């Protein structure tokens, strides 16, 4: 058994003194003071905040096929360092988990290497090509968390509709990277004033919002749970809000970088600032914040997307899309939104725990007696600088290097086992 002493937990929105007794994989007791019995391992939280473990429904672990960027082991170590105890990896790997054979191989890699709980997606279409549906019932039987072709949008309405019908039959979500290929125009950043200043092709807002508008109507017709990945535009927020008001089962996520940065933060032709969807305008960012606070957007997900340094050293027009986020999400959001009084600590924790779990009917995301001992101990008071050399991910492609942040996890536990502690 383990006993976390001298911690603070959120109760009714306030930090309260609490000890947590853990028996195996579950929390046995939470109380203001618990006397240790013989043989109990004591973990001294030293007055720090003990949070439910975070749940990230959108990460890229790159394995199999992209191990030079990230592996299941390094990606989940990075997740643990960031306080995440559950992650859901996208299927844009090689091979794609689009068959029982491929999914079984992926699951074995996870079983052998993962440092946190991993709930893998299966693809919607074979090889994510948008031409042939996968076998939904067979992949659900293997353990598919949900279905997505993330990395690309499903381009034809008929294929998306047929996929939604199949997903509804097996009671799983369709999770969509919304991007109309006919509207990308070879873009490498947001189509706006900054792209014009830099002379870089831009991706317009409608590239995303048009596909969401199509899909919410398809989801209504199919009776399917439809989840929108990494919402980035004000038009998308409006479409999702209207769909929810109409009673359509649509949910959505937003990334930390879209909440924190805009096109105005891009200093020049620097691919560290290249992600998909791109950093949008100030108006878009404000709409995302409003949508998160009013419940239009359900949760926060990182879209952790590691790449090799030489790949991101290329010009924006040639470099791959994506930034890492597992190790920086909570500190950045805590520093920029909670420390300055825009959000409460409870709000932020909910966006990373209860909200994603409610979105996908997961049994995690809370600290409660008889619940899983998934938790992270966080130092809310000490300032640290974000440094790439401190990352446990293979990659450090993020524009937040050098930022000074509070709220750094110092210990992460998954089902009662310590998976990250300090610099270990």
From Swiss-Prot:
It catalyses: (S)-dihydroorotate + H2O = N-carbamoyl-L-aspartate + H(+). The active site is at 303. Transmembrane segments: none annotated. One of its GO terms (molecular function) is allantoinase activity. Pathway: Pyrimidine metabolism; UMP biosynthesis via de novo pathway; (S)-dihydroorotate from bicarbonate: step 3/3. Pfam families: Amidohydro_1. Binds 2 Zn(2+) ions per subunit. Its cofactor is Zn(2+). Gene3D superfamilies: Metal-dependent hydrolases (3.20.20.140), Urease, subunit C, domain 1 (2.30.40.10). Zn(2+) 2 binds at residues 150, 177, 230. Zn(2+) 1 binds at residues 58, 60, 150, 303. One of its GO terms (cellular component) is cytoplasm. GO terms for biological process: 'de novo' UMP biosynthetic process; purine nucleobase catabolic process. Belongs to the metallo-dependent hydrolases superfamily. DHOase family. Class I DHOase subfamily. Catalyzes the reversible cyclization of carbamoyl aspartate to dihydroorotate. This is Dihydroorotase. It comes from Staphylococcus aureus (strain Mu50 / ATCC 700699).
């Amino acid at each position: 058994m383990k006993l976390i002493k001298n911690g603070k937990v959120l109760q009714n929105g306030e930090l309260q003194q609490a000890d947590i007794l853990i028996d195996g994989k579950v929390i046995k007791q939470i109380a203001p003071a618990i006397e240790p019995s013989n043989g109990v391992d004591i973990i001294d939280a030293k007055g720090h905040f003990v949070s439910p473990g975070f749940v990230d429904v959108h990460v890229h672990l790159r394995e199999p096929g992209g191990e030079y960027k990230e592996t299941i082991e390094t990606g989940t170590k990075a997740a643990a360092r960031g306080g995440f105890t559950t992650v859901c990896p996208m299927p844009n790997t090689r091979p794609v988990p689009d068959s029982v054979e491929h999914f079984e191989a992926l699951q074995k890699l996870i079983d052998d290497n993962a440092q946190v709980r991993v709930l893998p997606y299966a693809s919607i279409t074979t090889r994510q090509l948008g031409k042939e549906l996968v076998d939904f019932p067979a992949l659900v039987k293997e353990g598919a968390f949900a279905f997505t072709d993330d990395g690309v949008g499903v381009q034809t309405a008929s294929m998306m509709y047929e996929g939604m019908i199949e997903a509804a039959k097996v009671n799983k979500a369709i999770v969509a990277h919304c991007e109309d290929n006919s509207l990308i125009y070879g873009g490498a950043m947001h189509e706006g004033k900054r792209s014009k200043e830099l002379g870089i092709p831009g991706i317009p807002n409608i590239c995303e919002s048009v596909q969401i508008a199509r899909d919410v109507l398809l989801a209504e017709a199919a009776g399917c749970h439809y989840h929108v990945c990494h919402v980035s535009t004000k038009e998308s927020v409006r479409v999702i809000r209207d769909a929810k008001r109409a009673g359509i089962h649509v949910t959505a996520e937003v990334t930390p970088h879209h909440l924190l940065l805009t096109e105005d933060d891009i200093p020049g032709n620097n691919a560290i600032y290249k992600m998909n969807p791109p950093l949008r305008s100030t108006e878009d960012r404000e709409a995302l914040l409003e949508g998160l606070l009013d419940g239009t957007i359900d949760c926060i997900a990182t879209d952790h997307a590691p790449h090799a340094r030489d790949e991101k050293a290329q010009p924006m027009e040639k470099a791959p899309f994506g930034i890492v986020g597992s190790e920086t999400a909570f500190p950045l959001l805590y520093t920029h939104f909670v420390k300055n009084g825009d959000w409460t600590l409870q709000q932020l924790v909910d966006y990373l725990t209860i909200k994603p779990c409610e979105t996908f009917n997961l049994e995690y995301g809370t600290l409660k007696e008889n619940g899983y001992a998934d938790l992270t101990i966080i130092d809310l008071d000490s300032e640290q600088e974000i440094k790439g050399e401190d990352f446990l991910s293979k990659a450090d492609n993020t524009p937040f290097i050098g930022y000074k942040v509070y709220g750094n996890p110092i210990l992460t536990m998954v089902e009662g086992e310590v998976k990250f502690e300090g610099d270990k």
